[in-house]
Design a protein with these regions (language model features):
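Short Lys/Arg-rich basic patches
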Residues: 1-25, 34, 43
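Short, basic amphipathic alpha-helical segments that act as recognition/interaction helices
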Residues: 3, 8-10, 28-29, 40-64
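C-terminal His-loop and adjacent cap/lid subdomain of alpha/beta-hydrolase
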Residues: 37
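Detector for repetitive beta-architecture
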Residues: 69, 74, 93, 99, ...
Length: 139
């Protein structure tokens, strides 16, 4: 099965919303920097801070990706991909850093027959039925 790996770009449509809890003083510092024009808004500050930390730890992240044999970027699994895995009598251990997606035409039965485990550092896009069927295999 040929790998379909695509590098993710940071576009508005390719983001995942997160919620964080900050102390009042930290939030006040962020608001002050926004007010002074250092950042356009709180989100700009937080994204910049996260990118800076990722750059700081970039080498460690790269080594960890290699050590864990993670696919980097976008990995999409179609019904045809999983049918090929099933025909070969194999099972997948999916490991993705980025976005893993399972096509809408994949049935829960096909997913159960072909996916042994899923580890996603990022986001998993799949139907509610697929996520429910694979719940004990998602880690």
């Amino acid at each position: 099965m040929a790998a379909q790996i695509h590098r993710l770009r940071d576009k508005a449509g390719e983001t995942e919303k997160i919620t964080i809890n900050l102390g009042y003083v930290d939030l006040g510092h962020i608001d002050l920097l926004v007010q002074e024009g250092f950042y356009s808004n709180r989100t700009d500050f937080i994204r910049t801070a996260i990118r800076n930390q990722l750059l700081t730890h970039g080498e460690e992240v790269r080594k960890s990706i290699v050590r864990h044999t993670l696919e980097l970027g976008l990995r999409h699994y179609t019904s045809a991909d999983l049918e090929a895995v099933k025909a070969a009598g194999e099972k997948l251990h999916i490991k993705v850093l980025g976005l893993a997606s399972i096509a809408p035409d994949v049935t829960p039965a096909l997913a159960l027959a072909t996916i042994e485990s899923i580890t996603v550092l990022g986001a998993l896009h799949a139907s509610k039925e697929i996520k429910s069927a694979l719940a004990d295999r998602i880690g």
